[in-house]
């Protein structure tokens, strides 16, 4: 008797476009490559304590409309230029959404938002948007969720995040060890920082793991380790952005032999998932920075053209410039928040 034991739960397998096809169709322009190189260098200097500016990763929770994303980028670029002496502003350009259960997984996975899962289209749209943003002079940041998409997009990312659900994952630590950009690891969803500290140490070491080449072939990858990794405080069972929390994290980092540097996420559990509270978190963190706290090297903010969020499932037409995932602050608050951060950096300098 013949037993069929393989692919029992697989409905269909489609070929994925090889990375090289996308890299040739949308090659990095000299301007885009220059934007990435300079931003990575600036972030490296901030992490090494050679630049006292604040890294600000700010933008929509997720990208679903490239047109609105480009308008946001144009507005943000003007503020980046204006506040460049105090802030290193990088746009949050998230294409992939880790879900606690199920839901829309982002522009790459389902670009047409209709459960058609045209991933090849998603990769094309994502790379073209990243290219346009970088070409304008605005650097981009993203979250890395798998081992394959970085081959399509990572050359256009100036900073990367590993999320709270994946910080403990071995494959994500291995991936971070080979990424060309600085990487932030979020504390665990329960608020523990040990997983992020372990992740920073792991990603700083060389690794050998499986991935794909630019030609789309399965490959064995050897990395040299990433020395530009840091922790992101995003809250847990309670917020963890206060001066008391920062002091505890600094102590934990020192004990682990790591530099006392933290980035604070104003959203997620730190805002108790209430988007307007990001402004309260900002006020508290600005007070710490203005008071001379040098350990706070960066912040993360969820912001869009229009405040709040909307449901993709409602069947209603989508409002322009409004998030379809986590709720974000609107543009007016964004402008005020960035100026507040810049003033705090000025005060820290005395």
Curated annotation (Swiss-Prot):
Pathway: Metabolic intermediate biosynthesis; chorismate biosynthesis; chorismate from D-erythrose 4-phosphate and phosphoenolpyruvate: step 1/7. It is an enzyme of class 2 (transferase). Pfam families: DAHP_synth_1. One of its GO terms (biological process) is amino acid biosynthetic process. It comes from the Bacteria. GO terms for molecular function: 3-deoxy-7-phosphoheptulonate synthase activity; identical protein binding. SUPFAM superfamilies: Aldolase. Its EC number is 2.5.1.54. Keywords: Acetylation, Amino-acid biosynthesis, Aromatic amino acid biosynthesis, Transferase. GO terms for cellular component: cytoplasm; cytosol. It catalyses: D-erythrose 4-phosphate + phosphoenolpyruvate + H2O = 7-phospho-2-dehydro-3-deoxy-D-arabino-heptonate + phosphate. The modification N6-acetyllysine is found at residue 244. There are 3 DAHP synthases, AroG is feedback-inhibited by Phe. The other 2 DAHP synthases are Tyr- and Trp-sensitive, respectively. PANTHER family: PHOSPHO-2-DEHYDRO-3-DEOXYHEPTONATE ALDOLASE DAHP SYNTHETASE (PTHR21225), PHOSPHO-2-DEHYDRO-3-DEOXYHEPTONATE ALDOLASE, TYROSINE-INHIBITED (PTHR21225:SF12). Stereospecific condensation of phosphoenolpyruvate (PEP) and D-erythrose-4-phosphate (E4P) giving rise to 3-deoxy-D-arabino-heptulosonate-7-phosphate (DAHP). Homotetramer. Belongs to the class-I DAHP synthase family. This is Phospho-2-dehydro-3-deoxyheptonate aldolase, Phe-sensitive. It comes from Escherichia coli (strain K12). The lineage of its organism: Bacteria, Pseudomonadati, Pseudomonadota, Gammaproteobacteria, Enterobacterales.
